């Protein structure tokens, strides 16, 4: 059976205390809604997101990553609530899976289990450790009789610990039947999608409870829950890579984006941050290093090194306080205190302490090319664009502003001068 997915993301998210919409708050360097969409598209080719607050901003972010997504705008003023969000929605498939836009930990397997349950109407539920403000599920022989919102629950209903996750799978035809019947005669004066349960039951449909893990379906409403969700996601990401052979030293101190890929035997030390679509192949990343959207193969990086986007390292050593950006390094040693930006450096070359590729002229970026077996002395500046051929020696303290031919020694220093007794003259001693 094909499934349509509808994601409710129109809420104001006031508890986030942010000018950005709640669903654009970042978890593991990515907007919360994108984590949900990634899972949704694993089970469906028809995904629609309901928006209202800062609609255009959210649409732009979503379409950059998932261009086939449909959108529906909710009229919050006249039709608030989860059922109000569905006004005007048309499903492309026989069954609709409805979930919230603040559930970044949901997995496609669980969503599919809920959607493909044989019942006409399924509700994902969990046993809550602390029911808090969750809607309570009234069950009879594992069939749902009704869902009661906390605001409207009596003392007996509040004692129930089986709670509504906010995820539903319902046949599109049933949805069309019951939606027009939902009223806002409750304390909040909202149109509750939970009312669809008793309305469907009145029409003779059975509503099944599908039990799920509370943690995987947690909603993120404030910065505390945002932090908790990220911690849980980080833990899951690192556990999965450890199962595949990656060694993490003090994993609680490291940050790994969900798009990072490890291949072969890799080792990651404490306080490391690896972001974006980085790929680490048979390499060691030492303490307090940051890697962004870069490829590291058969290399060691750090400690205290920074690879900015578009770096490609192979058989290379990058030491402490070395920053690279858009650098192609093959068989290179850069031990300490250097900036290597917009450059290509070939195998056997050694980059001395304090080397800088001066890549920016105030308007455009320029490239530095360094060939094989080049020895670069300490405190060297390359004024790009510049090309250094193979087997060149650059003397320490040089400012390289022209191309250097193969086998040459390049020296460019200010002429030394010693003025006798200058100290005494200056300070009149």
Curated annotation (Swiss-Prot):
Gene3D superfamilies per UniProt: Hexapeptide repeat proteins (2.160.10.10), Spore Coat Polysaccharide Biosynthesis Protein SpsA, Chain A (3.90.550.10)
Biological processes per GO annotation: cell morphogenesis; cell wall organization; lipid A biosynthetic process; peptidoglycan biosynthetic process; regulation of cell shape; UDP-N-acetylglucosamine biosynthetic process
Residue segments, region Linker: 224-244
EC numbers, comma separated: 2.7.7.23, 2.3.1.157
Top class in the EC scheme: transferase
Keyword Metal-binding carried by entry: yes
Pathway: Nucleotide-sugar biosynthesis; UDP-N-acetyl-alpha-D-glucosamine biosynthesis; N-acetyl-alpha-D-glucosamine 1-phosphate from alpha-D-glucosamine 6-phosphate (route II): step 2/2; Nucleotide-sugar biosynthesis; UDP-N-acetyl-alpha-D-glucosamine biosynthesis; UDP-N-acetyl-alpha-D-glucosamine from N-acetyl-alpha-D-glucosamine 1-phosphate: step 1/1; Bacterial outer membrane biogenesis; LPS lipid A biosynthesis
Cofactor: Mg(2+)
UniProt subcellular location: Cytoplasm
Family: In the N-terminal section; belongs to the N-acetylglucosamine-1-phosphate uridyltransferase family. In the C-terminal section; belongs to the transferase hexapeptide repeat family.
Xref: PANTHER family: BIFUNCTIONAL PROTEIN GLMU (PTHR43584:SF3), NUCLEOTIDYL TRANSFERASE (PTHR43584)
Subunit (UniProt): Homotrimer.
Protein name (database record): Bifunctional protein GlmU
Organism of provenance: Campylobacter lari (strain RM2100 / D67 / ATCC BAA-1060)
């Amino acid at each position: 059976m094909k499934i349509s997915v509808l994601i409710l993301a129109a809420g104001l998210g006031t508890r986030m205390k942010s000018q950005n919409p709640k669903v654009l708050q970042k978890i593991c360097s990515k907007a919360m809604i994108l984590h949900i969409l990634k899972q949704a598209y694993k089970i469906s080719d028809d995904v629609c997101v309901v928006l209202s607050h800062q609609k255009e901003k959210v649409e732009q972010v979503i379409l950059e990553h998932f261009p086939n997504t449909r959108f529906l705008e909710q009229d919050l003023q006249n039709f608030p609530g989860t059922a109000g969000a569905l006004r005007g929605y048309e499903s492309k498939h026989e069954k609709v899976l409805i979930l919230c836009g603040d559930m970044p930990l949901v997995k496609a397997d669980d969503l599919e289990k809920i959607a493909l349950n044989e019942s006409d109407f399924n509700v994902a539920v969990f046993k809550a450790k602390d029911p808090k403000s969750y809607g309570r599920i009234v069950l009879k022989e594992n069939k749902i009789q009704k869902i009661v919102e906390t605001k409207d629950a009596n003392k007996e209903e509040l004692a129930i610990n089986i709670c509504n996750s906010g995820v539903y799978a319902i046949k599109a035809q049933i949805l069309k039947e019951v939606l027009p019947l939902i009223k806002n005669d409750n304390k909040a004066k909202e149109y509750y999608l939970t009312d669809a349960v008793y309305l469907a039951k009145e029409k003779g449909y059975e509503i099944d409870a599908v039990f799920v893990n509370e943690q995987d379906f947690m909603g993120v409403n404030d910065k505390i829950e945002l932090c908790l969700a990220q911690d849980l996601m980080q833990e899951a990401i690192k556990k999965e890579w450890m199962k595949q052979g990656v060694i993490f030293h003090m994993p609680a101190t490291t940050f790994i984006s969900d798009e990072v890929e490890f291949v072969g035997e890799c080792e990651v030390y404490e306080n490391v941050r690896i972001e974006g679509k980085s790929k680490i192949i048979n390499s060691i990343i030492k303490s307090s290093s940051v890697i962004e959207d870069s490829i590291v193969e058969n290399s060691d990086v750090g400690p205290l090194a920074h690879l900015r986007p578009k770096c490609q390292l192979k058989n290379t050593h990058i030491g402490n306080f070395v920053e690279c950006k858009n650098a192609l390094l093959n068989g290179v040693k850069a031990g300490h205190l250097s900036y290597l930006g917009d450059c290509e450096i070939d195998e056997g070359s050694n980059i001395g302490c304090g080397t800088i590729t001066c890549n920016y002229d105030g308007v455009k970026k320029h490239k530095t090319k360094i060939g094989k077996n080049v020895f670069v002395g300490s405190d060297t500046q390359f004024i790009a664009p510049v090309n250094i051929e193979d087997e060149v020696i650059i003397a320490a303290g040089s400012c390289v502003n022209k191309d250097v031919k193969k086998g040459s020694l390049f020296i460019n220093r200010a002429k030394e001068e010693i003025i006798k007794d200058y100290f005494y003259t200056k300070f009149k001693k």
